[in-house]
Amino acid sequence: MSKEKFQRIRTHINVGTIGHVDHGKTTLTAAITTVLSKKYGGCARAFDQIDNAPEEKARGITINTSHVEYDTEFRHYAHVDCPGHADYVKNMITGAAQMDGAILVVAATDGPMPQTREHILLARQVGVPHIVVFLNKCDMVDDLELLELVEMEVRELLSQYDFPGDSAPIIQGSALKALEGDEKWSSKVLELSSILDNYIPEPKRSIDKPFLLPIEDVFSISGRGTVVTGRVESGIIKVGEEVEIVGIKDTVKTTCTGIEMFRKLLDEGRAGENVGVLLRGTKRDEVERGQVLSKPGCIKPHSNFESEVYILNKDEGGRHTPFFKGYRPQFYFRTTDVTGTIELPKEVEMVMPGDNIKMVVHLISPIAMDDGLRFAIREGGRTVGAGVVSRVIS
């Protein structure tokens, strides 16, 4: 009887390729899976398999995304690649594929182009924490000075958007040659894989973050008090701990006196679990859906924020007409809608369906939020846009 192969539990990291159209993002994705599958096992994916990306829906928005996976020496990676520029914009704004780090692909033959800049800006706005650069098509450049020049431009561009341009790793390679099996260039892909292992730190797991539970429902149980239910977004809650109720109304402190899951009593509720939390001395009408239960002091309510937003086009079920400043839709955060008004950048008169845009939002009541929180924009219950908080304005 053959023995099962021993599986070491590996750190799981989410990455993706970003960069200008035709600079080689998909070719590099194929090359990574091909080169690494030879060394560490796993499945090689051909260019066509990745390029014909299936449609997915995230927050009601159709996005074409290819997901591949591969192993490196120390880790397991899930990697996203998008065929079109619009798909990147939607993907990054909706957080459909959250990235722990991105591989920026820049063709050495072109240098940084408009979408290179736009993707770096988006990565900054939506909180992609780390960028590694793959300078592609270096087999087509004989002039070493030209390579140095392109590298300098890329570093300047990264620094412009608050990434560490001076210290960001840049690998000079050729995705196509590596995909064709050329050893010199395959070694560059292996170099990229070890840089991913060393440069992108292990992400903080949601269980290690402070406790947060978006409230979905509120009940009162006679003789026991008020119970709020929801899915624990992060951290751990234990019986007897002090918690805060944040958002919509003034922040209130209370104590958790009991935790239930599937009608069983628990000592604690953990990230990912659906639980009911019994609150001491809290009245039924003091809590509502849309607030959050959190570890005291770890999240504050805010009404004003800067955001990066994608507006659905009409084929996606969005608006058929543009909107202008003073537009008042609902902003759906976690479990609830809050009305807000928008401020557009000075040079923008109107926003068309299918656009992505920076806007400042003023909500009529405050919501517990931090930078990086995702939201949907809705009109009468229908999603017309998706956004991410890029900066809270206190």
Swiss-Prot record:
One GO CC term on file: cytosol
Region (G2): 60-64
Group of enzyme by EC: hydrolase
Domain tr-type G intervals: 10-204
Calcium recorded as keyword: no
GO molecular function: GTP binding; GTPase activity; guanosine tetraphosphate binding; translation elongation factor activity
Record region (G1): 19-26
Binding site for Mg(2+): 26
Keywords: Cytoplasm, Elongation factor, GTP-binding, Hydrolase, Magnesium, Metal-binding, Nucleotide-binding, Protein biosynthesis
Residue numbers spanned by region G3: 81-84
Catalyzed reactions per annotation: GTP + H2O = GDP + phosphate + H(+)
Record note on quaternary structure: Monomer.
Cited NCBIfam families: EF-Tu, PRK00049.1, PRK12735.1, PRK12736.1, small_GTP
Protein name per UniProt: Elongation factor Tu
Species name: Blochmanniella floridana
Recorded name of the encoding gene: tuf
